Amino acid sequence: MGPFGSNIKAECFVEEGIPVLNGSNLTSYEINDGALRYITIKKAQSLGRALASRGDVIVTHRGTLGQISYIPDTSKFKNYIISQSQFRMRLNKTIVMPEYFVYYFHTPEGQWKILSNKTQTGVPALGRPTSTFKKLSIPLPSLSTQAKVVEFVHSIQRKINTNNQINDYLTELLDAKFDRMLEGSGSWSEASLLDIASYKNGLAMQKFRPKPGDSGLPVLKIRELGQGCCGADAERCQSDIDEGVMVHDGDLIFSWSGTLLLDFWAGGDAGLNQHLFKVTSESYPSWFYYMWTKHHLHKFIAMAKDRATTMGHIKRSALADSRVLIPEQGTLAELTNSMQPIVNQVITNKVECRKLSELRDALLPKLMSGEIDASKVDITQLNNHLSDY
């Protein structure tokens, strides 16, 4: 089990050391190394059983139930500290591969086994989490069969990881091109963010629940923007909401309250919740208003942090006060020829990652049940099936 909160106080955190995991690091099969905080090696050693290593499985037992991830051999760090809402499992690898174990609990059957042990009052939690998990039974094929399933998932994950790495490079390239652009912008005309784009606020989607017979749309909130998709537990809204607050792949979304985020959405059709802007323009290409909004993002984050008495946010006046430099049409066209294809490729890669994830999740239960033989799935042909998702 993770340490009590009182064992890791704010003053324990340092710039580098042993990373501390939280729920945001358990969003997929493998842990991710985003938004980590650190404690000293000495402090980590004092926490004993809260220390997790490569090959360990981490489970959330309080809060966002259903989260379960393993620490891969390729993790950025050798050791991690789990939070007070998590527990660590160290499996007998002569019987079960950690990857296969985690995959099972990501299937509908596995999720049901976890969530059926949820307590019914207060904060969502597993009753007697470690002993409860020890009593769960799962079907285990031979290690060779497990390895086939694991290799199939790894093959998809490698493609997803490659796309993400390409997007990291393309994002850096966009930043470099934008910085170079600013060096020659001395004679350009001035405007504001509100002059170049529309920042459409979402709706309080709890007022627009699906009507009987309407499967609805998932609601895009700040959490979903941060994780890049709408999970199975996302709230839903009616499917005939106004197009102005309907989000499609490639739309630029800016959360202006709470955690300020800016990203191109690639999670499929959704309804835009309040506290997020859908950014569009009839006069300028998406790269232009994206890069200028991003240019001011650090300022917006600082402004939100200064609002200590309320949830951090920015006002629309901040957009009106944010300067934009606009080149003449010929120069803008040249810049667009250089910048827009990069943005388009980033979006294409993000959408492909989502579809690969959906394909993986659809096939995984069939692979684990033996309905599909993993050794007979040709990973090189997966792209031919992405249009089905």
Locate predicted features:
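Sequence-specific dsDNA recognition surfaces
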Residues: 1-11, 24-57, 194-209, 216-249, ...
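Non-catalytic DNA-recognition/assembly elements of restriction-modification systems
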Residues: 1-9, 135-204, 225-228, 325, ...
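Extended, non-catalytic scaffold segments that flank or surround catalytic motifs
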Residues: 1-29, 98, 103-107, 115-120, ...
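Short coil/turn segments at secondary-structure boundaries
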Residues: 7-15, 35, 116-118, 189, ...
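A short beta-sheet element
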Residues: 22-23, 42-110, 122, 241-298, ...
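A short glycine-rich beta-alpha junction/loop motif
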Residues: 79-87, 119-150, 270-277, 307-333
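Amphipathic heptad-repeat alpha-helical coiled-coil/stalk segments that mediate oligomerization
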Residues: 373-389
